[in-house]
Regions:
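A short beta-strand-turn-helix
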Residues: 31-55, 72
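Thiol/disulfide oxidoreductase modules built on the thioredoxin-like
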Residues: 107, 116-162
Length: 164
């Protein structure tokens, strides 16, 4: 019985992701993104454009009901923290659907597409994206201050935006 408990505890401890990284991996930074004009960037190039600013990353898709439901709360964050850069990373595999979603839902911010979608790619692997929406906050120094939030209304988002 003790051996079974030890095995179960080992499995739980090794399968859960307790890591809360403060920096993106080299592989994630090298992942490819496209802007709405279909210009190719590495994730690192995108982040460098906003160096010195706080960034809220929203990993979303036009087909995602929870993503769309969270937009009013995200727009409220934008109202409360207008100095923050809002970086929308879409996992839509259909580029036209992604662009229509931006227009239809009137999403203001910086928009990029992860062309491999939610199941593949170094950045989605690094973020361990198994559900969207997913929010990540980066401070002015490029440090990840909030690694995982699944709702725009998560109080931790506001907390790190105020404190960092």
């Amino acid at each position: 019985m003790v051996k079974k408990i030890a095995i179960v505890l080992f499995f739980i401890m090794t399968s859960c992701n307790f890591e809360k990284p403060t920096q993106f991996s080299t592989e994630a930074l090298q992942d490819t993104l496209y802007d709405v004009s279909h210009k190719k960037y590495s994730f690192q190039q995108v982040l460098e454009q906003y160096k010195g600013k706080k960034i809220v990353i929203d990993v979303w898709a036009s087909w995602c009901r929870d993503c769309v439901r969270g937009l009013p709360q995200l727009k409220e964050l934008q109202r409360k923290f207008p100095e923050v850069t809002y970086l929308f990373l879409s996992v839509d595999t259909n580029v036209n659907s992604w662009k229509r979603g931006i227009q239809h839902y009137q999403i203001k911010g910086e928009h990029y597409n992860l062309p491999k979608g939610m199941k593949k790619g170094a950045l989605v692997d690094f973020l361990n994206v198994s559900w969207i929406p997913r929010y990540v906050v980066i401070d002015e120094n490029g440090k990840i201050t909030l690694f995982k939030a699944t709702k725009a209304s998560d109080k931790n988002i506001e907390k790190v935006l105020k404190n960092s």
